[in-house]
From Swiss-Prot:
Family per record: Belongs to the ZIP transporter (TC 2.A.5) family. ZupT subfamily.
GO cellular component, one term: membrane
Transmembrane segments: 25-45, 102-122, 129-149, 155-175, 198-218, 230-250, 261-281, 289-309, 354-374, 383-403, 405-425, 465-485, 528-548, 552-572, 585-605
Biological process terms in GO annotation: zinc ion transport
Compartments, record wording: Membrane
Pfam families found in the cross-reference section: Zip (PF02535)
Origin superkingdom: Eukaryota
Name recorded for this polypeptide: Putative zinc transporter At3g08650
Organism of this sequence: Arabidopsis thaliana
Alphabetical list of PANTHER family matching this protein: OS05G0316100 PROTEIN, ZINC/IRON TRANSPORTER
Keyword set, alphabetical order: Ion transport, Membrane, Transmembrane, Transmembrane helix, Transport, Zinc, Zinc transport
Primary residence: membrane
Molecular functions per Gene Ontology: metal ion transmembrane transporter activity
Membrane topology recorded in Swiss-Prot or TrEMBL: Multi-pass membrane protein
Amino acid sequence: MFVRSNILRALIFTVLEKTCLEIKMMHSSCKGLVLLLFLFVVVFIGNTDANAQWEVSHKVRASPHENMGRNVIDGSGVEKTLHDIGMGEKRGTHNKVSVSTVALFTLAMAAATGLGAVPFFFVELDPQWAGICNGMAAGVMLAASFDLVKEGQEHGSGNWVVTGILAGALFIWLCKQILEQYGEVSMLDIKGADATKVVLVIGIMTLHSFGEGSGVGVSFAGSKGFSQGLLVTLAIAVHNIPEGLAVSMVLASRGVSPQNAMLWSIITSLPQPLVAVPAFLCADAFSKFLPFCTGFAAGCMIWMVIAEVLPDAFKEASPSQVASAATISVASMEALSTLFESFTHDYNSEDASGFFVSLLFGLGPLLGGVFLVASAVTFRLQHALLMGVASGIAFVLGLWRPLQLLLSAKMGLIPLVSLLAIGAGLSHFTSSTILNVTGRKKSRAGSLINPVTNFPTSVITLQSLLACGAVGFHALAEGLALGVAAPNAYGLGRHMVLPVSLHGLPRGTAVASCVFGATDSWHAALAAAALIGFVGPISAIGSILAGIDYSGLDHVMVVACGGLLPSFWQVIKRAVRLERRKGSVGMVLGLACAVVCLTFTRLVCLHTPYCNSAPEAVR
């Protein structure tokens, strides 16, 4: 082995020596390519010797009794062939997960990237926000590069990671030089320097998806099989959403439509499923290339952030705004990665099941929002009626759980009223403070239109949004209880998504009705319902990761219920002043809708086993 390595080194250096004589005659881009090749070859030769020496010493230590027939006598005295050992491991791991399962899960993981473009269907960016978005994109890309470097170091030699970083930076610099030589570049109706930057950003994010796809494939082929692969897939799917947001922000800040931004965000993640399947089938081979690939993608992103993305951000926003946006983005991404890492290092099958089930808790509010918007558009429901519906539902949600606790003697009247008063006081104080601050700013600006969202920011709209915030806090408290229950579900109780979705349906209806009545925008109503739907799963996942129990959750729930009452009292007062009859009818409809949904949830839990582990908060 050493003789072959020396011969290979001599041949390569002979060729390089002759090639160097012609470098002076080459173009500048060719010189860079030769330099990149030279750097790669030098590190390759060094690592070849190091790996060969490590392999020999490792074999001597691991199997000193090795015979000439490739038979190894292990520590237990059992004689096995190396071929049988390797084939046995591969057969064992591949029998656990099918190729189609890996392909379907990774396709869904890649599609999650498109969710990052959803906000731009409802928001138009002014120049200052475009600069802040570029700062956020820079933070996301930097955080992704940190994770790539760490992942590469975990899979092999740090030398390959360093080589990949340098090679990636050199590669992206050469690509920029080549694009500039072609003159004006156009893409998605963008021309000139902006088009060049868009091409580079999309290309870099696509390159870095190769490493993530191979990592997912290798995780499915690991010793823990499907459970480990599922957790890694879910982690990267959640991780893909802010990365899709980063790509969409770069595109939207340059005038690209939301549809195209979503399409290109998904395209940047398509290498994940394309690489995951081969990586699953050839896990050992892909593991050896991961360190260089992750370092290469990290080097590309670091160079692009410093050379292109941040300078563009500084043109539109102040340095403090850009720095704050980038820092918050990095901190958020690293916090997300830390949570998933801690979970994957110490988990069991129950946690994995609860983690997966928790993602489905948002279906109820989303369906409620869709139902409300469809009804409002079809029957041309008036604003007063819609606000009355929202208030009626909120009053039922605010009183349902406190009455359960009181009637079951799990909480006394005085503590219950005290917690409701605390929630109401906090809600009133927060709403009053925000309305006063916003009112002073409006009086100085002399405008009632927000240039960022194009939605009227009148007192009516602000009160409606604050009321939706109270519903969000209620969903968060309920999600904590669901997260405690999800890992303990058994039998048909694993399907408690049915009662939970039915329980959450009036919440989405209330939010969509409130927003639609205030803004007359079905886009905003659906977005608000979807956002409230996300609060429950995120809260449930957080409780699983934190490992909390039921103690104290009823108190949090009662405080959240108290916050609903004053918020929607203002909404119903406004609806009655606008049109007394329709506001009153809407409130009655809302009360009836909420009572019917919650009663049916109770009946499902009483007469089916779907709620055998669900908390009382959703029964």
